Every structure is written in C-alpha cells, then in structure tokens.
Design a protein with these regions (language model features):
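Glycine-rich phosphate-binding loops at beta-strand->alpha-helix junctions
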Residues: 70, 246-278
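Short beta-strand scaffold segments in enzyme catalytic cores
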Residues: 71-75, 126, 173, 191-197
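Short glycine-rich, Thr/Ser-proximal phosphate-binding strand/loop in the N-terminal lobe
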Residues: 56-102, 133-135, 200-229
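Low-complexity, polybasic segments enriched for Lys interleaved with small residues
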Residues: 2-53
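Glycine-rich phosphate-binding loop plus the immediately following alpha-helix
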Residues: 149-171, 201-238
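Short glycine-aspartate micro-motif
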Residues: 61-65, 119-121, 182-186, 256
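Glycine-rich phosphate-binding loop and adjoining helix at the ATP-binding site
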Residues: 85-109, 113-121, 127-181, 221, ...
Length: 296
C-alpha cells in the first residue's frame, strides 16, 4: 500500500512559518537620555570672608570738602583711597547753615545709598573748634558763629558720627610726611593755613585775615578775587612773596601748597616747597579718624 503524503501537516507548518515571518519585529527602544549633570551648589562666602567684607564697609568714610565756590564729596577707605565717584555742586550764596545742610544732604544721598559709609569727615572753610563753626568768611552769611554744623549734618544723615576741622587742615593731613614742622597754604576762594609738628595737627592759625600788604589780608592779597583782578602774572609774584614771609614766620621744614589755584603757579618752587593735588581735600578726611590725636 503506497504511503500517503502528510500534506495537511506540511501545509500547516508552512502557514505557521508565514505567520511568524509576517509579524513585525518589535521596534528597538531609543536609549534613555542621560539626565543633565547637576551643577555643584555655589559656595557660600566663608565666615572670614564675610567678616572681612563687613570690616571693609565699616572702614568707609564719607569725606566732604566745603569750599567757598563748590561742595565736593566722595567715599574713601581708611587709607584715604577714593572708592566712589566724586560729586560736586556749587556752594549756595549767600549760604545759611540750614541751606548748607540741605545742599549737602542732597549731594551725598546717592553715595550713602550705594556705599554705606560708617563715618563722615568734613573740611570747612573757616575756624572750627570742637565740631562747631566759629567763622565762615566765604559763605556770605553772618549767622555762623557757634553753629554745631557736624551735629546738624549727622542728624540729617542717619546719626552717623561726624568730625569736622578746617579745610586747609584736611588737605594737610593728606599731604604731610609726619616729620618736623610742616606748614600748609591753600589757594582757593581765599587763603587757608594749617600747622603740623611731627605729623600732629597744631592749634589753628587763621592767617587769612592777617594784614600782609598795604592793609590787605592774605585773602585780599592772594585769594581768587585778587588773582582775577591782578592777573596770573602779578598774582604769582604775590604768592612767591608770601612763601618768603611764611618761611621767616614759621621756619618750616616743609611747605605744602594746595587748593584749586595751586595749579596756576608758574614760578620755580624752593626745594622744601611742594604743590599737592586738590583731591587732598577729600583724601585727608581718612586721617581725621586715625588713632593719633589732633589738638584743637
């Protein structure tokens, strides 16, 4: 009996193969995206760094230079280095104490907000004693005697401690070398003077109103109004004469000449005489707070 082919079984097998091959292969999964690397947290300033920054801010001083024609201010550090822009406005004329305080408060407000100074130094164009004004010849008002200007300004500026001396004395603090007798002459709206011995400020000498020539005081002889009237050439001769008078009067080891008109000097200065930048009126404010005492 001839053997029968298992056609049914083979057909079903072929059908199974076709069925399997007809199925699509499963789609390959895309590799999982790596999570972005986390940035390490920013390091906080160390306690020592924070204290150093606080000390730096605590050393900041608002230095104010009151002149007969301009009010100037800047923030300085304990070494007298300027740490802010220098701001300036014209001095009001006539200028009462209240007008001056108002003008200064407006002038320095941006510096206070941005730099947070801890103290205030003031150079004033007149005789100052114990933070009070005794004379203010270039401010055009007679109501200045005994005015507690430092306290008035402190009251307007949040109670910050304030020290105030004559403006020529502030310039001298920035310029002096601290050896021997050093004298300061400032040439601006008027003539200012200051005397130092071994770096220490001596009692104030107000030579500006002392007669020097034909009944004219220093202010009237070499002040800015006198320069404008006489011309720079004659004015230079007058300043040269004053240097000789001061040498005989004070017998200084060094004479420093400051103020806005010091830049107008054209003659050769003696070896022991030097001109200083007008910025000294700001920079010297730092030494008002140095531990070394200053005599009234």
């Amino acid at each position: 009996m001839p053997t029968r082919k298992a056609t049914g079984t083979k057909a079903s097998a072929r059908s199974a193969v076709k069925s399997v091959s007809a199925k699509k292969a499963p789609a390959k999964r895309a590799p999982a995206k790596k999570a972005p690397a986390r940035r390490p947290p920013a390091k906080r300033a160390s306690a020592a760094g924070q204290k150093a920054a606080a000390r730096s801010r605590g050393d900041r001083i608002l230095a104010i230079d009151i002149g007969g024609t301009g009010l100037k201010a800047a923030v300085i550090d304990a070494d007298g280095q300027i740490k802010s822009e220098r701001v300036r406005v014209p001095t009001p004329h006539p200028c009462t104490p209240d007008q001056l305080v108002d003008a200064l408060a407006t002038l320095v407000e941006p510096l206070l907000v941005q730099h947070h100074p801890a103290r205030i130094s003031i150079g004033f164009p007149g005789v100052v004693r114990n933070n009070r004004v005794l004379t203010a010849p270039h401010l055009g008002d007679e109501g200045w005697r005994g005015v507690p200007l430092a306290a008035m300004l402190a009251g307007r500026l949040g109670g910050l401690p304030v020290r105030m001396i004559n403006d020529a004395e502030v310039q001298g603090l920035a310029a002096i070398e601290g050896r021997g007798i050093e004298f300061v002459l400032t040439l601006g709206t008027g003539a200012g003077t200051a005397l130092f011995r071994d770096g220490e400020l001596m009692p104030h000498l107000e030579l500006a109103h002392h007669p020097v020539s034909k009944g004219r005081a220093y202010d009237e002889y070499i002040g800015d109004a006198a320069r404008a009237k006489a011309g720079d050439k004659r004015w230079n001769k007058r300043v040269e004469k004053i240097i000789g008078i001061l040498a005989a009067l004070v017998n200084y080891d060094k004479l420093w000449i400051g103020g806005g008109n010091a830049a107008r000097l054209t003659f050769d200065l003696p070896a022991n005489v030097a001109a200083v930048s007008n910025a000294a009126g700001i920079e010297g404010g730092a030494k008002l707070w140095h531990s070394r005492s200053m005599r009234e």
